[in-house]
């Protein structure tokens, strides 16, 4: 049974099993991914969405809504409490506003941002970072509540700024967000050093993912892109540029 499998490939066993349960055939899955694994870039969600689309497309037509549902089910085999945020963005593309109670809303605006992703190559565990945040909350309830309120306000501000295409101000908000993350203890010396380089050479830089390792990202524009890439490469960091994809899953 699926529950007995202990492997990061568990979501694919789930998808394959579900797709052929009433069919007299097997299935072989090969995964080719350029996304660094376990680096806070949503590689598992991207693979779950691609896997669900590819596997179920073999047996007939499938809508994006159905792909998303299957991808989230598959991801839950390894991350039980996943919000589905990463799978949703991978499926539909663009920028998503996510609220735990209201769900997802796509922002109908396509800003021309350039991102630089920088990998610390430090292993980290999402679970241990979540525990660390929980521990901080239990010990510092008032401070945690204050930071949560500041974060909610910051998200509201960023949503407005994205719609107005104000890249410089968005960068400042990213730096502010990074301060909040450092306050709750999910950064470390190496990430702080990387972020300092990013903040000095771009509009803003912060941790992506759960922290403790993995990647950071810096926000820039076309004219400054090569300069930032060079800065990080000169400091022996693995980095690459990325743009926001507004199509999402495009095999349909």
Regions found by a protein language model. Give the residues of each.
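FAD-binding core of FAD-dependent oxidoreductases
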Residues: 38-48, 82-93, 206, 210-213
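Short beta-strands and strand-loop turn motifs
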Residues: 32, 174, 207-211
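C-terminal nucleotide
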Residues: 1-10, 14-17, 58-61, 69-81, ...
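DPxDG-like acidic metal-binding loop motif
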Residues: 41-62
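Residues that form or immediately flank small-molecule/cofactor binding pockets and catalytic motifs
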Residues: 34, 212, 244-246
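Metal-dependent C-N hydrolase catalytic cores
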Residues: 2, 31, 35-37, 48-51
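Glycine- and acidic-rich phosphate- and metal-coordinating loops
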Residues: 12-39, 70
């Amino acid at each position: 049974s699926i529950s007995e499998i202990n492997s990061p490939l568990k979501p694919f066993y789930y998808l394959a099993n579900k797709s052929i349960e009433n069919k007299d055939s097997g299935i072989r899955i090969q995964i080719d991914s350029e996304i660094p694994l376990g680096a806070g870039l949503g590689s598992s969600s991207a693979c779950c969405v691609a896997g669900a689309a590819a596997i179920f497309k073999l047996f007939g037509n499938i809508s994006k809504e159905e792909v998303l549902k299957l991808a989230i089910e598959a991801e839950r085999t390894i991350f039980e409490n996943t919000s589905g945020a990463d799978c949703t963005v991978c499926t539909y593309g663009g920028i998503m506003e996510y609220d735990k109670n209201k769900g997802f809303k796509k922002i109908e605006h396509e800003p021309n941002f350039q991102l630089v992703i920088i990998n610390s190559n430090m292993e980290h565990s999402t679970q241990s970072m979540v525990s660390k945040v929980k521990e901080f909350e239990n010990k510092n309830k008032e401070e945690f509540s204050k930071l949560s309120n500041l974060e909610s306000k910051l998200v509201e501000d960023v949503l407005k700024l994205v719609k107005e295409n104000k890249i410089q101000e968005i960068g400042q908000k990213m730096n502010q967000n990074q301060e909040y993350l450092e306050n709750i203890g999910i950064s470390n010396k190496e990430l702080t050093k990387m972020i300092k380089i990013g903040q000095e050479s771009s509009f803003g830089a912060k941790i992506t993912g759960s922290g403790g390792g993995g990647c950071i990202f810096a926000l820039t524009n076309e004219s400054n892109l090569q300069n930032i890439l060079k800065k990080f490469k000169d400091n022996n960091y693995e980095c690459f540029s990325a743009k926001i994809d507004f199509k999402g899953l495009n095999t349909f």
